[in-house]
Amino acid sequence: MNTSSNAQQHIDQQRAPKPLSILILGGTGFIGPHQVEYALSRGHTVTLFNRGRTNPSLFPKVEKLIGDRNVPNGYDALKGRKFDVVIDNPVQIPRWVTEAGAVLKDTTNRYMFVSTLSAYASRQKIGITEADEALLSEPAPVNDLLATRIRGAAG
């Protein structure tokens, strides 16, 4: 998979000054493969955590932990593991962020939540910008409360 333009390839080839251990929740869908390739090109160690259903043959040399955020004990594969950075991609349900934050708060230095799904109300419009209407799955006060809880769980 070639995710980089020619101009970007030069940047991608530069090694990071300090290699990091990066956990990517998801990693094989829409944006994850680009993150994985970039991190690997910089010399980082990448671990994927997902259900193993979407593009499971991608990245054969990357460690893959299997887990399901929809079931009790779905994060068990992460127990006892430490990471410098966690990138959380496949969030469709707010409690997933809360639960992941609670599981990982003592074992990671940085937790990055990336929302790539259903952020905007219209899926029909081409050229959506930050000024367009956001899609709220809950009324605004509930979203505010959930955001506060998520920040607290993540430490």
Task: Tell what function each PLM region has.
Residues 14-16, 38, 56:
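A generic structural signal for short, solvent-exposed coil/turn residues
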Residues 21-42:
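N-terminal Rossmann NAD(P)H-binding glycine-rich loop of SDR-like oxidoreductase domains
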Residues 45-46:
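Short beta-strand element of Class I
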Residues 49-53:
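N-terminal Rossmann-fold cofactor-binding loop
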